[in-house]
């Protein structure tokens, strides 16, 4: 039963352990491509990828943990083992909740990660990556992110990587001549433009799609102009500060871009990076990357620590609820399967009995009522055992029950136990269930 016994396996490569180069290496071409590649693996039932400027994460639902890690080598194979965090089912769920709440971000509590997770969810759902397991996990994470920001002050102050970049430029006195350039017109570019508009007199916005750049230029309350990417070299010569935040797969700048520039400071928060590695060796160019933002975000982190403690409590509370929800759903699915199997056997035996003798309607009702009572009594103890097993995380018992009570088991056309029971002995059945299973079924397993 696809999805009924699977569990989540996840990997995370983030700014906590990985360099900017390693983050760039780990990232797939796109979240969509990553999910499609993961789903191409026959062991993977569900999949989602989350790629931002400071993290690359992948999650799959599989029946075997090692199969999951093998599939997730899509992200991990080209980076050192010590920058990869491997996560099992519960670790993955808790981590997702923490990510959505902003507890794992460079800027503690920043808002953008919640939108990025929503986008990753919609992307994965669009290509068939979201099933019941990830549906519950990711939507719960989004709910936690919303609670964190409405019930605490986790996102007060510097609230984005873009605003942290502006603060860094201000600290380094790079905003003194009044002109700044933003490259990229996505959400991060919009935030950078808004933050810069409070510090400079003139803003240039460059983007591959000029109308998008025009939209940002029109949204700020200072002198602002939009331009295409082929006008970047001229724009750099006018600006003393640049924030680059495109989602381009190609580098936007080259060394020649800075040939006519004066002193310019660039914060490159794109993933992959927009600025070539050798640019910071030019005497007039200073390049800052995500690592440089740590000094700016440390102050914000300290201010938000009390709020973070409240968010941790929200995460703990919602995590416990999520686990209970998973356990209840999985136990209910197995119990439903068990009852379906019993109903098939009951219906077949009633039909056989009623056709073999001349029962009137009242007698037939008595036979059917007796059969219902027998099924209920037989399954009462296994039902309790399954619910107890779910509460105690005893998934081996639940998996055995799924095999034993497969809907095809005991069907009228089946004279022998189905294929899945080959190699299974009576001793493999949990004690609480074995005592309640009809001897005929046990004999068929023993004979096989």
Swiss-Prot record:
Region (Disordered): 406-435
BP-aspect Gene Ontology terms: protoporphyrinogen IX biosynthetic process from glutamate
Superkingdom of the source species: Archaea
Pathway assigned in UniProt: Porphyrin-containing compound metabolism; protoporphyrin-IX biosynthesis; 5-aminolevulinate from L-glutamyl-tRNA(Glu): step 1/2
InterPro entries (UniProt xref): 4pyrrol_synth_GluRdtase, 4pyrrol_synth_GluRdtase_dimer, 4pyrrol_synth_GluRdtase_N, GluRdtase_CS, GluRdtase_dimer_dom_sf, GluRdtase_N_sf, NAD(P)-bd_dom_sf, Shikm_DH/Glu-tRNA_Rdtase
Substrates-to-products reaction catalysed: (S)-4-amino-5-oxopentanoate + tRNA(Glu) + NADP(+) = L-glutamyl-tRNA(Glu) + NADPH + H(+)
UniProt keywords, alphabetically: NADP, Oxidoreductase, Porphyrin biosynthesis
Residue positions binding NADP(+): 184-189
Positions bound to substrate: 52-55, 105, 110-112, 116
Positions bearing the site annotation: Important for activity: 95
Active site, UniProt feature: 53 (nucleophile)
Oligomeric and partner information: Homodimer.
Family affiliation: Belongs to the glutamyl-tRNA reductase family.
Described function: Catalyzes the NADPH-dependent reduction of glutamyl-tRNA(Glu) to glutamate 1-semialdehyde (GSA).
HAMAP family: Glu_tRNA_reductase
Annotated protein name in UniProt: Glutamyl-tRNA reductase
């Amino acid at each position: 039963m696809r999805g009924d016994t699977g569990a989540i396996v996840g990997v995370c490569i983030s700014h906590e352990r990985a360099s900017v180069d390693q983050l760039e290496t780990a990232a797939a071409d796109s979240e969509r491509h990553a999910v499609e590649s993961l789903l191409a693996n026959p062991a993977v039932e569900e999949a989602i990828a989350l790629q931002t400027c400071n993290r690359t994460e992948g999650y799959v639902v599989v029946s075997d943990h090692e199969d999951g890690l093998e599939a997730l080598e899509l992200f991990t194979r080209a980076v050192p083992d010590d920058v990869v965090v491997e996560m099992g089912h519960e670790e993955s769920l808790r981590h997702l909740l923490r990510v959505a709440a902003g507890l794992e971000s460079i800027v503690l509590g920043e808002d953008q990660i919640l939108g990025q997770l929503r986008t990753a969810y919609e992307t994965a759902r669009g290509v068939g990556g979201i099933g019941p397991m990830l549906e519950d996990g990711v939507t719960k994470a989004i709910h936690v992110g919303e609670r964190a920001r409405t019930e605490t002050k986790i996102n007060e102050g510097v609230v984005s990587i873009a605003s942290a970049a502006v603060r860094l430029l201000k600290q380094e006195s790079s905003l003194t001549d009044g002109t700044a350039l933003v490259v990229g017109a996505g959400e991060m570019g919009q935030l950078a433009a808004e933050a810069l508009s409070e510090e400079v007199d003139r803003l240039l916005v460059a983007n591959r799609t000029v109308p998008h750049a025009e939209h940002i230029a029109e949204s700020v309350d200072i002198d602002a102009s939009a331009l295409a990417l082929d006008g970047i070299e001229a724009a750099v010569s006018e600006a003393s500060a640049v924030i680059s935040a495109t989602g381009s797969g190609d580098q936007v700048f080259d060394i020649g871009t800075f040939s006519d520039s004066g002193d310019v400071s660039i914060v490159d928060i794109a993933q992959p990076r927009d600025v070539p590695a050798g640019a910071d060796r030019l005497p007039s160019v200073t390049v800052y990357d995500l690592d440089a933002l740590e000094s700016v975000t440390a102050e914000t982190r300290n201010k938000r620590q009390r709020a973070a403690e409240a968010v941790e409590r929200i995460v703990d509370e919602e995590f416990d609820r999520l686990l209970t929800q998973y356990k209840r759903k999985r136990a209910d699915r197995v119990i439903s399967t068990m009852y379906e199997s019993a109903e098939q056997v009951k219906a077949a035996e009633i039909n056989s009995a009623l056709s073999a003798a001349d029962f009137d309607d009242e007698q037939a009702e008595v036979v059917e009522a007796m059969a219902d009572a027998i099924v209920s009594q037989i399954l009462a103890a296994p039902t309790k055992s399954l619910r107890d097993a779910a509460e105690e995380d005893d998934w081996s018992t639940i998996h055995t029950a799924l095999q034993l009570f497969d809907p095809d088991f005991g069907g009228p056309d089946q004279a022998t136990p189905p294929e899945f029971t080959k190699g299974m002995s009576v001793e493999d059945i949990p004690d609480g269930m074995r005592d309640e299973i009809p001897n005929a079924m046990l004999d068929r397993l023993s004979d096989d």
